[in-house]
C-alpha cells in the first residue's frame, strides 16, 4: 500500500489499468545490495496526466524513442513490459482504454502503430478491425483532418463481451 501511495503522490496516477509484468531478483542485479523489483505497465493517456508529476520528484514523461540509457537491468524491464503490452494488445482490446469515447479509425490505427512500433497498411487494418464487428459507426464526422471528414466510431464493449462468450478471439 505504501508503494501505491508513493506512485499516486509522485505521478498523480490513480485508479488506472495496470498489469504486472515480472519480478526481478537476480543476486547481481544491483552492485550495492540484494534488490527485488516488480514491474508493471499502465495504460494512460499522458495528456491527462501531463501536469500531475511533482516538480520536485525529478520524474518526466518521455517517448520511448527519446529514452535515455537505463541503469542496471532496467532496459530489460522496459523491454519485457513492451513485449507484454504488445502481446496483450494483440489478444485483447486494451487500446480502447486510451482513446476518447468516440474516435476515428485513423486514431485507432495510430494507437496500434504506436503500440507495435510499426506502420500498418491502412486498408488491411480497417478491413480487419471492422470485420471484428466490435465497433459502431456514428453518423457524426471529424472534419478537422479533411473536408470530407472521417466517421467517428465507438467501441461496443457489450457486443464484444457477448461475442467472447461465444468463442470470439480478438487478434490484431
Whereabouts are the PLM-identified features?
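Active-site segment of metal-dependent pyrophosphate-handling enzymes
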Residues: 9-52, 66, 86-95, 132-136
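Core RNA-modification/binding signature centered on pseudouridine synthases
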Residues: 91-172
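A generic structural signal for well-ordered coil/turn residues at beta-strand boundaries
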Residues: 36, 55-58, 149
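C-terminal catalytic core of Y-nucleophile DNA break-rejoin enzymes
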Residues: 37, 70-72, 118
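Short, small-residue-biased leader/transition segments that mark boundaries at the very start
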Residues: 1-5
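NUDIX/MutT-family hydrolases
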Residues: 41-42, 50-89, 98-106, 124-133, ...
